[in-house]
Amino acid sequence: MESKIKHFISCIAWPGLMVLCMTMMAYGFTRDRPVLYFNVAYVILIVTLFFLERWMPHEREWTKSDGQTLANILHTLSSKGTTQLLLLFGGIIGLMGLMEDPGRGIWPRDWPLAAQVLLGVVVAEFPLYWAHRVGHEWPFLWRFHAVHHSVIKLWIVNTGRFHFVDSLYKIVPSVGLLLALGAPLAVVIWLSAFTGFIGMLTHCNVEMRLGPLSWIFNTPELHRWHHSKDLREANKNYCENVMVWDLMFGTYFRESHRRPPADIGIREFMPPRFVDQIMWPFLSQEGKQQIEVGCRLIS
């Protein structure tokens, strides 16, 4: 009986939780408090996934501690709590106020809001895709993005594990493009909320059966392939929310006949301490070697 219940939940968890969160956002807009209701929905999502990760994990081995919980939380506070909040809700929203004039830009403000949000997701995905892709293909940017890929398991707590520089070079072009086109503030808020919900679901260690959803959205299945140690699998699935540009540029990867690898991470060294991880991309080769030797002696 329990196995049937788990199977049923694995089929409805992703779409059910996404619909719940987006419905709460819609209600928040009707109450003129979208940010408050985003936070409420986000907490509900975290608590639900935390429970499901323990009851029906995708990888049982990933439920064990990797010693990175504190570093993950600090990275989340650094990248999401500082970079995104200051940039998006500070400077960006200030600029948005200047662009509320309907005569600015070429954005189709006469469209229904739902259609504008859908357009915003697809348009913003283009710079997100390329920022993520060059983060893998350009060694200078990979040194920052490697912090995220150095994890040896995926779960909700490392959703926000990004070097703050990594977050900046993704947020600025994506939101900046919407600004340049004249998108209203509501579209940016919806995009931010959708990205937050997708990110949490994408990184969760919950057994989910996604089916055709993985052809449209960035799902846990696709992102597990993206975290593979095999670069033929890892250098794929760059889209953050919807897979349109991966499909268009030939970087979509999915093999339904086998599970994504449980052995994930990077082959290069990454120090375990948060402070060292923040400094790591800026260090010389000699400085990195000194930290690596020190870490190996301690371990």
Regions found by a protein language model. Give the residues of each.
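Membrane-embedded catalytic scaffold of the fatty acid hydroxylase/desaturase
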Residues: 74-262
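Hydrophobic core segments of alpha-helical transmembrane domains in multi-pass membrane proteins
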Residues: 38-46, 188-195
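Membrane-helix interface linkers and caps
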Residues: 47-74, 94-108
